[in-house]
Amino acid sequence: VELRLGDPLDSDFDRKLAQLVPDGRPGRGITRDRRHMLIGLPRVDSVSSNQDLGEAISAAAASMRQRSSAEAPKVRMLPHKIDYAALVPQASQSDQPNLRILVGINETELAPTFLEFGDQPHMMIFGDSECGKTGLLRTMCREIVRTTTPEQVQLFIVDYRRTLLGVVETEHLAKYAMSSNTLVDEVPALIELLKSRMPGPDVTQQELRDRSWWSGPEIYILVDDYDLVALASGNPLLPLTEYLPHSKDIGLHVVIARRTSGASRAMFEPMMARMKDLSCIGLQMSGNKDEGVLLGTVRPSEQPPGRGTLVMRSGGQQLIQVAWSDPR
């Protein structure tokens, strides 16, 4: 429907007909099939005034409740906070815990939501300050520790702000880089490991299918505040870029989290550009809509902490609430 417009020339239905909609008559307008219409007041007391409309609506609702005992089912909404410990018992066991990670619940079914790294090996997370990016990485770390052994998964954490310090205290933690100097020192050994997993000319087709020419854990590189790592002066993680397309073969998973502000420009940075080209998992949390579309068809918007739109090949786009776990 289309109500009275300030300028009939703005009508999407019929400009001439829009000129005939009287001014000062609330509820008058036109329909898409070019008919005049009048919207009725939402009251049942035969009063044609909008005075005390709120009270009249409440009285009408009370009257209807008295006539019938039936009630409409309550609309289930995403909670503003869900504890990771409370969510764990609801999650089904996975036969590939090193590739399927529980992170929260979705809006459609209010059911546990998993990141499917077996289908899409990498992930990008966008969100502004205090939106829950670090909370998501913390939940991922704790879920990996809960469901896997150090022989199945090794974590390489890049955390310049030290917000993930102490989250992983088991042998799952391979390296913890808290500064650029530390990261520069650790990357060469990581690159050598990945290089050793690349299939050589003597690898058979059967070995390629089974991924049996090497053995070892899946490697997860979790990077918080990626905008502090990838600077104009250089990016210590840049050597990883050439291995990203081979991630399923060599057991590599890169998860980067950065602020939404400035992300539209940062998408041209080599590593982020390659991850986007490879159709990685994406989570768009709270951010300024002026940044434009960064993941799928999702435009940033204001969201409560922990809330975001998850973009995955298997599940399309869905709103989720990330499970919260205490920093300590």
Q: Model features per residue range: what roles?
A:
Residues 1-2, 6, 94-280, 287:
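P-loop NTPase catalytic phosphate-binding loop
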